[in-house]
Amino acid sequence: MILVNLFEPKIIAIVPAAGIGSRMKIDVPKQYIKIQNRTILEHTLTTLLLHPNIVQIIVSLNKKDNYFHKLSISSNFRIISVVGGEKRINSVLSGLIVVKNVDWVIVHDAVRPCLSYKDLEKLISIIKKNPVGAILARPVSDTIKYSNLKQKKAVYTVYRKNLWHALTPQLFQVELLKNCLKKIIKDQISVTDEASALEYCGYNPLLVLGSCRNIKITWPEDLVLANFYLKNHIIDK
């Protein structure tokens, strides 16, 4: 039994899961690929369910999704689903619209099944320190090249000293994120994560160091690494 700490803020989690994962070149959306006899999405949701102050998880689904409600985890009383949009921003906003009486929201990629509870707790603890919010991130360690898109040639090397690799979850105040996303849509600005929307509106979320094991399943080889982490229970080590 999970008891909610009444002295801590209640949090809603939104998991955009409307993508089809075209880069994986498979018939099933990548969030429904199985690792260790469970789908990637089930692994992702299970970690979020462990935190006592996440009172509800909203999963934004593709309107043609025929997989989610076949999963046993979909019947968990803390999980609901909504129809997402064509883009991530629309899927997140679809989730925010149904949020009531909660001040904070976490947005987490459906295909990051290796999030550790330790990192989740570290991020949530930031609520007491920064009213804007925060994201998990890691300093860039590789050399980054800017390319000519058509010819795929290196044009110049990007100075990496102040560069961070954005991860999820990302944590913000509900109304602040909702307003920033609406402005992004109104201004027709393209963003790839929620922090970008806040940055566009003049806010600066904190960067919280996250684990390198919190990988996003994008390419087939990512499945091998995720399987290794989950099989050997080394996510929190």
UniProtKB/Swiss-Prot annotation:
Residues at the site labelled Transition state stabilizer: 23, 30
UniProt xrefs under PROSITE patterns: ISPD
GO molecular function: 2-C-methyl-D-erythritol 4-phosphate cytidylyltransferase activity
Pathway: Isoprenoid biosynthesis; isopentenyl diphosphate biosynthesis via DXP pathway; isopentenyl diphosphate from 1-deoxy-D-xylulose 5-phosphate: step 2/6
Entry keywords, A to Z: Isoprene biosynthesis, Nucleotidyltransferase, Transferase
Catalytic activity: 2-C-methyl-D-erythritol 4-phosphate + CTP + H(+) = 4-CDP-2-C-methyl-D-erythritol + diphosphate
Disulphide bonds in the chain: none
Site, Positions MEP for the nucleophilic attack: residue positions: 160, 216
Keyword Isomerase listed: no
Entries under InterPro entries matching the protein: IspD, IspD/TarI, IspD/TarI_cytidylyltransf_bact, ISPD_synthase_CS, Nucleotide-diphossugar_trans
Regions crossing the membrane: none
Any Pfam family hit: IspD
Tree of life domain: Bacteria
Oligomeric form and interacting partners: Homodimer.
NCBIfam families, per the entry: ispD
PANTHER family on file: 2-C-METHYL-D-ERYTHRITOL 4-PHOSPHATE CYTIDYLYLTRANSFERASE, CHLOROPLASTIC
Role this protein plays: Catalyzes the formation of 4-diphosphocytidyl-2-C-methyl-D-erythritol from CTP and 2-C-methyl-D-erythritol 4-phosphate (MEP).
Name used for this protein in its record: 2-C-methyl-D-erythritol 4-phosphate cytidylyltransferase
